[in-house]
Amino acid sequence: SIQGTMAAGLTVCMLFGGMDVSQFSVAGLAGMFLGILYDAGCNDYVTLLLVMLLGVALGAVNAFLICNLKISPMIATMGMQFVLRGFCYIATNGAYVYLKSPVFDFIGNGKVFGAIPFCLIIMAVIYLILWYVMKYTKFGRNVYACGGNHKAAQLAGINVSFMRYKAHMISSLCAAIGGIIMTCQNTASMCNAGEGSDMDCIAAVTLGGLALAGGKGKMVGTLIGI
């Protein structure tokens, strides 16, 4: 469910014609931020909201590097990958923060009706929302148009830069949610969480039939690829 949740957001980014290899570092930092807020006594639900907002903000930073500083998406997100992972170690000195909250325990290890993992339900809801958005909304059509040809989309009146911001923010938001699930499953905030898994989501998305150049692919394909 961790990779599945993150791959859902990455699908939107790659359909746009972008790339994001920083997802697991975003997830790692989200987990560390969750641990820091929990250790500081912050309300559990406020903590979850702030962690997701952090994910959105990091996605905006990625888009800024690409759109405004004209850095290649691969290089920009790879740079963020190393910066964020380094920050995880610096901010905590490599220490773990153990979570003893029933809310976090239920997110990571709880089951609905005694059989269905709650984290699997989170993943399913995200896929349903993004499937609907990509198939039936103007935003979804614009993402496919941009993925097909950025210049043609710009000439058609689509704000390609703004669309890139949205795509990367969705990707990093899903990464942050994946980081929340990963941290809750481990029952601890760990600075090295997700290390070495940076290409897992990209592999799943491409196995699901999404074109690396963008513009072709479906959410269902990614789900199968997982």
What is the role of each PLM region?
Residues 30-31, 54, 80-84, 122, ...:
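Transmembrane alpha-helical core residues of multi-pass small-molecule transporters
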Residues 43-51, 57-62, 112-189:
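Helix-loop-helix "hairpin" substructures at the membrane interface of multi-pass membrane proteins
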